[in-house]
């Protein structure tokens, strides 16, 4: 009796891996053994950078808040300290958005927090 192979599942598995490598350059996009390594590495980078993105955006928000705070005669650290003492709970993302989109409102926040 001939050996039955599971060609449908094998083809589906290969297609799934090749689909993830769509747009990869050269043999990294069409030779299965190379594609497997390339896709594995791409997924490692994606995992790492999803976490790094959070740090990057937080530092961007802090830079924006600091720049806007300095225009209002204070610094980021003094502003955040004063906000915590007055128990004003606006997170950095929203505060940076206010600083960029509505500088007048940001100035009001700074004046209300810093006496």
UniProtKB/Swiss-Prot annotation:
Name the UniProt record assigns to this protein: Large ribosomal subunit protein bL20
Gene Ontology CC, one term: ribonucleoprotein complex
CDD domains: Ribosomal_L20 (cd07026)
Family according to the record: Belongs to the bacterial ribosomal protein bL20 family.
Domain of life of the organism encoding this protein: Bacteria
GO biological process, one term: ribosomal large subunit assembly
SUPFAM superfamilies xref list: Ribosomal protein L20
HAMAP family: Ribosomal_bL20 (MF_00382)
Species of provenance: Chlorobium limicola (strain DSM 245 / NBRC 103803 / 6330)
């Amino acid at each position: 009796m001939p050996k039955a192979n599971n060609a449908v599942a094998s083809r589906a598995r290969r297609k799934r891996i090749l689909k993830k490598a769509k747009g990869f350059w050269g043999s990294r996009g069409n030779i299965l053994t190379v594609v497997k390594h390339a896709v594995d590495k791409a997924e490692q980078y994606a995992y790492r950078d999803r976490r790094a993105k959070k740090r990057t955006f937080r530092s961007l928000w802090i830079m924006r808040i600091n720049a806007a705070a300095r225009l209002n005669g204070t610094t980021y650290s003094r502003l955040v300290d004063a906000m915590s003492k007055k128990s004003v709970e606006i997170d950095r993302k929203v505060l940076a958005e206010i600083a960029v989109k509505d500088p007048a409102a940001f100035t009001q926040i700074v004046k209300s927090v810093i006496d």
